[in-house]
Amino acid sequence: MKKKKIIFSGGSGRFGKIFQEVNLNYKIYFPSKKLLDITNVKKINSYIKKIKPDYFIHCAGLSRPMNIHYKDLSKSIDLNIIGTSNVVKVCQKNKIKLIYFSTNYAYPGFKGNYKEESALLPFNNYGWSKLGGECAVNMYKNSLILRICMTEKPFLHKKAFADLKTNFMFHEELANILIKLINKKGILNIGGKIQTVYDFAKKHNKDVKKTSARKMLGKKYPLNQSMNILKYTRIKNKIF
């Protein structure tokens, strides 16, 4: 049986490198930034015409450091909003299923337990840039938006916030289940159980120390960025 083809943008990033190690029954292409320039519709179209993929997993874009989305507004817009819009245009034109990596930062981050249909109000420019990409993806019905909360393994920091709740999961968990999700459509929150960053980190690094997001990031910083992952959990339970 002929393997279906997937183009994965952002293969040189943290998650992309881990995803490349997963043994899958698909032919997956990880083009370089030069080969697949998402700011150039003609280049995207040319590469897609050559590969003829069944799926396009769009993970490429600008993420860290977070202040880059303030310091270089043009780059943030070009990559995360316009670049994503370009990918949508080409996928729609060629009838390719699109899977888009978004973020839990699309939610306000104050009340927590946000469902996929909850009101959106990003609390920083990174969240706005990813939500801008979502707007384009939502216009294309043959798509799946993943609002993801994940981090590197092992936990990189010596201190962790004891007053900030979220849904951290490691890249490896998503890498191992992503391929099982690609035929879904709509919007899906992806992450681990709701807990403080400190509680998550402590399970994997006993030496991590407590610190306060309120003290470090200010009184206005949202402290409950957690998502409701019931839909994701139900899907995962059916798979395994």
Give the positions of each predicted feature:
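N-terminal Rossmann NAD(P)H-binding glycine-rich loop of SDR-like oxidoreductase domains
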Residues: 3-25
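Adenosine-cofactor binding site in Rossmann-like domains, unifying the SAM/SAH pocket
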Residues: 24-47
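NAD(P)H-binding glycine-rich loop region in Rossmannoid oxidoreductase-like domains
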Residues: 41-79
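Active-site "gating" loop of Rossmann-like NAD(P)-dependent oxidoreductase/epimerase domains
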Residues: 62-74, 103-123
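NAD(P)-cofactor binding segment of oxidoreductase domains
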Residues: 70-99
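Active-site Tyr-X1-5-Lys
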Residues: 121-149
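Substrate-positioning beta->alpha
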Residues: 148, 155-183
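Mid/C-terminal beta-alpha module of Rossmann-like enzyme folds, strongest
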Residues: 177, 181-224
